[in-house]
């Protein structure tokens, strides 16, 4: 940038001492130093902002590349699953045609899903309804809390009774 050596700085200082005078030179030097510091901070902020924008643009490019790769993988998986499903259906269709179709325990090819089995098993959805359905003797036997206390209330309840502490000033 600007090539300032020791000799050039000494020359600038001597000229400033003659022009400005020895009384105002320290104040002017402080002001110039503060302005140079501000300029350096501003330049550093601009550099940091530019580098952040460049990194952000690179991250955006990486994100789009990653999303494209994920879409390609998803398409490939769906394609393979569809092909395997079709092959399985064709194989099952061929097996049904050769079996004669007189099987009573086949169930019509219905396979229940996990969700249907889960709903049939649980029945109730609400946690409160499930908890309320249990009898009180069962809750007592299995240590299910019926009456919940806060931590502070529990500490107060179980803290041993002590006599009041005396003040330092009494």
Curated annotation (Swiss-Prot):
<dbReference type="GO" id="GO:0033281">
    <property type="term" value="C:TAT protein transport complex"/>
</dbReference>
<comment type="function">
    <text>Part of the twin-arginine translocation (Tat) system that transports large folded proteins containing a characteristic twin-arginine motif in their signal peptide across membranes. Together with TatC, TatB is part of a receptor directly interacting with Tat signal peptides. TatB may form an oligomeric binding site that transiently accommodates folded Tat precursor proteins before their translocation.</text>
</comment>
<keyword id="KW-0997">Cell inner membrane</keyword>
<keyword id="KW-0653">Protein transport</keyword>
<protein>
    <recommendedName>
        <fullName>Sec-independent protein translocase protein TatB</fullName>
    </recommendedName>
</protein>
<keyword id="KW-0811">Translocation</keyword>
<feature type="transmembrane region" description="Helical">
    <location>
        <begin position="1"/>
        <end position="21"/>
    </location>
</feature>
<dbReference type="Pfam" id="PF02416">
    <property type="entry name" value="TatA_B_E"/>
</dbReference>
<dbReference type="InterPro" id="IPR003369">
    <property type="entry name" value="TatA/B/E"/>
</dbReference>
<keyword id="KW-0813">Transport</keyword>
<keyword id="KW-0472">Membrane</keyword>
<keyword id="KW-1133">Transmembrane helix</keyword>
<keyword id="KW-1003">Cell membrane</keyword>
<dbReference type="GO" id="GO:0043953">
    <property type="term" value="P:protein transport by the Tat complex"/>
</dbReference>
<comment type="similarity">
    <text>Belongs to the TatB family.</text>
</comment>
<comment type="subunit">
    <text>The Tat system comprises two distinct complexes: a TatABC complex, containing multiple copies of TatA, TatB and TatC subunits, and a separate TatA complex, containing only TatA subunits. Substrates initially bind to the TatABC complex, which probably triggers association of the separate TatA complex to form the active translocon.</text>
</comment>
<dbReference type="GO" id="GO:0008320">
    <property type="term" value="F:protein transmembrane transporter activity"/>
</dbReference>
<keyword id="KW-0812">Transmembrane</keyword>
<dbReference type="InterPro" id="IPR018448">
    <property type="entry name" value="TatB"/>
</dbReference>
